[in-house]
Amino acid sequence: MMYFVISAMKAQIEIIPCKICGDKSSGIHYGVITCEGCKGFFRRSQQSNAAYSCPRQKNCLIDRTSRNRCQHCRLQKCLAVGMSRDAVKFGRMSKKQRDSLYAEVQKHRLQQQQRDHQQQPGEAEPLTPTYGLSTNGLTELHDDLSGYMNGHTPDGTKPDSGVSSFYLDIQPSPDQSGLDINGIKPEPICDFTPGSGFFPYCSFTNGETSPTVSMAELEHLAQNISKSHMETCQYLREELQQMTWQAFLQEEVENYQSKPREVMWQLCAIKITEAIQYVVEFAKRIDGFMELCQNDQIVLLKAGSLEVVFVRMCRAFDPQNNTVYFDGKYAGPDVFKSLGCDDLISSVFEFGKNLCSMHLSEDEIALFSAFVLMSADRSWLQEKVKVEKLQQKIQLALQHVLQKNHREDGILTKLICKVSTLRALCSRHTEKLTAFKAIYPDIVRAHFPPLYKELFGSDFEQSMPVDG
């Protein structure tokens, strides 16, 4: 029986930071190791032959936080480190290039090991490339689709025909909490039973699962989840707010609309997969998640990861212009027209707008995301009671934070009501993928990210273990 492939795959190329901005890289793009953001920026600059100007002295610092402030200096750095449109097509790397790349990978891996060794217990660890997006078998989109369709990996070799190299890494992360719960006196006690009405939207198997939780434990859990959320966000909220003015121009919108349907689907599948990798790391850092059995960790991630992506999307949503951050700029629904999923896109944007209208803080987004992820009513759970207890504690922590933030009465109920909307969105996404797969089975099988296929493929039910 096929099963969900798990591996603590060692990061290879992705361990080397982006040569442009220093962010987490996703592979070799246009001949240089870069992140997805810089790859997309360079592609757009070449497609539009843009003539950027620098408002300063043409020596702007380009890093993860400043890369969107000066397009001129960012493009100059791309060119200076060797990014080139021709590099996409030059094929197999020379032995000298491979040896040089291998040496650099080894150097960064050694540096990573040294940092890990020096890491103090409880100290926050930055995101590592262990959950990053592997681009084996994937190259540039649209203009570069011909090379991609030939099925070559970035080093010019044919991809493996066996097990995919795309893995969901649920190996334990080091302690990320930075909090010391030892010695906290559990004086104030919250004892909530299902009969009390505190969990009106949760269906629990028996009254014995109701948690007895100290206020100190709730505070600790809330801090742990909030910290885990902030450490695993793709973008800081401040960065996103600074970029809201960078909306796609009409010419760029038409460029997306003219993409072949399969190319746009592939692009969106890659973007969703990238976001899900961050959700996986978020889950691993939540107190209690790694104590669940491996089967249940997988079930929760497979069933809930896209729901959390939709929740997190509200951070990157601009309700005033009805746009969302996508592929380097803010995009309206019309950017996604070539997908052929207008109803789904409309519903996703409507959900983002509605969630934005609740003006959730980062803490509240974090706890609601954790609550959604730890849903105890998922099929195939082996230790349902254990998951129920964890979800109940998270809901208590969410209510604790809402009360501490002086939120209006009824907001918890409104949030929990969003769960059914999230599930409807994800169900519709699966329906659209199934319809697309029926028309383009070879594209999905050969060219979509393997993790995306594992999460949303129609063989999900057959691949899950059967109890008893």
From Swiss-Prot:
Q: What does UniProt note about where in the body, tissue by tissue, this protein is expressed?
A: Expressed in the brain, in cerebellar-like structures, including Purkinje cells.
**Highest rank taxon of the organism:** Eukaryota
Please give a single GO biological process term from the UniProt record. Answer: rhythmic process
A family per Pfam: zf-C4
Q: Where in the cell is it found?
A: Nucleus
Which PROSITE patterns did the record assign? NR_LBD (PS51843), NUCLEAR_REC_DBD_1 (PS00031), NUCLEAR_REC_DBD_2 (PS51030)
Report the GO terms under cellular component: nucleus
Q: Which UniProt keywords apply?
A: Activator, Biological rhythms, Developmental protein, DNA-binding, Metal-binding, Nucleus, Receptor, Transcription, Transcription regulation, Zinc, Zinc-finger
Q: Where is this region: AF-2?
A: 444-455
Q: Which family does it belong to?
A: Belongs to the nuclear hormone receptor family. NR1 subfamily.
Q: Function, please? A: Nuclear receptor that binds DNA as a monomer to ROR response elements (RORE). Required for proper cerebellum development.
Q: What is this protein called?
A: Nuclear receptor ROR-alpha A
* Species of the source: Danio rerio
Gene that this polypeptide is encoded by: roraa
